Each structure stands twice: as C-alpha cells, then as structure tokens.
Amino acid sequence: SQLNRRNLGRRAGRSLVTVGSMAAGAFLVVSTGAFRKAPPASPTDLKSGTGGFSFWGESAVPIYDDLNQDEAISLFDLNRSLLLGANVVPLRLREGDDASCLNLNNALRPKIFGIKVSDFEGRFEFAEGNWSSLYQKPDGGAIPALVDQNTLMWAMKMGIGGRLNYVDGEGNPLEIEVVGALKGSMLQGALFIKEEDFLDKFKQQGGYLSFLLTGDKDDA
C-alpha cells in the first residue's frame, strides 16, 4: 500500500533489518528441511537406516536368557503371537557418555555395545569398512569398533583410525580404535565391538540390556 511504501522510505534502515531478518529465518527453515531424511519405504529393507529391524528395546536389568526360545518366552510371560516370526537380536551394553545430537560437547567415552557379528552381516550401509572390519587387529592391542558416520563426525569429532581411551572391567587402560563408519543408520550415539572383545574386557557386564527385533511393525 501507499502507507507501506512511505514507511519504507522514511525509515529505510529499520525496514531493511526487518526484511533481512525475515529472509534469514525463511532461509534457515528451508535449508534445515533439506537435510531431513525420509523414512525407508520398508523398515525390513536390510540396507536401509533401520538395517531391517522394526523395534529397539531396552531392559532395566540384565537378561541372561535367549528370548527366541520358548523357555524364556514363558519365563518372562511374553506374548507368543507378537513374537511369531520375529527374531530377537541381543546386545551387551557398557554405559558411557551421551554421544547423541542432544549433547553439544565432545563425547570422550561413548557407550559401547557388544554384538554378535553374524547377527548384523548384510545389514545397514557403510561409508567406510563393513562388519568384517571388527576382526581387524589394530596396533598396540586396541579393540576395533564401528560407529555411525554422523556420531563419528559431530559427537566424537574424529575420523577413521581415531582412538578413544577407556578403562576395562579390571581397571586397566583400554584403547578402542574406530575402523569403520555406518552411513545414515539408527545406530547413532555408540560404539559397536565384537561380543568376544566385550566379554574379554568387560567381564563384569553380564547379560544383555538392549534388544533389536525383526518383524512386522503392524503387529505391535
């Protein structure tokens, strides 16, 4: 309108700041949305960010039983119909620093998952390395580990070959070396090592505290 045009000419500096702020805000919204990842068309796709897993659960206390067996299903009074056709993949866990996007600080010692490599072969995509990289033998007796690429870059602020210092279950110094990085996965915020290495270095961390499940999400 004529009033708006007159106001722009009267206080051009203030008007320029207002228009610039609105333009910057619109740019931030659009640019942030460009990085948004769409969910996979099928969560059962082994190469998607879910690795073909439909659910990720945690336990407040260690579980020592195989949740795929009838004995464990009866012991914990689990719903058999929901677990029909599903497979439960257990993970050992050693707690550590928060390495998620909620932590703006450098994660020096992220939590560690101990996994059975055979349960993960063929799942997820890698920016570098693969699950077989966990069988490498780094110099100095370091333990090989895999981590999500985004966690490695932004939370840990290091690259492939970087090392982190821990203390094992017996109080001895322990080095863990990053030997590979997953690409765009849900496995962010933690390191993943072989179960054999986990049991060797963290004997006191008995049982399983985290579980990945395959199956149809519509049956939940």
Predicted regions and their residues:
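Alpha-helical transmembrane segments of bacterial inner-membrane membrane proteins
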Residues: 1-220
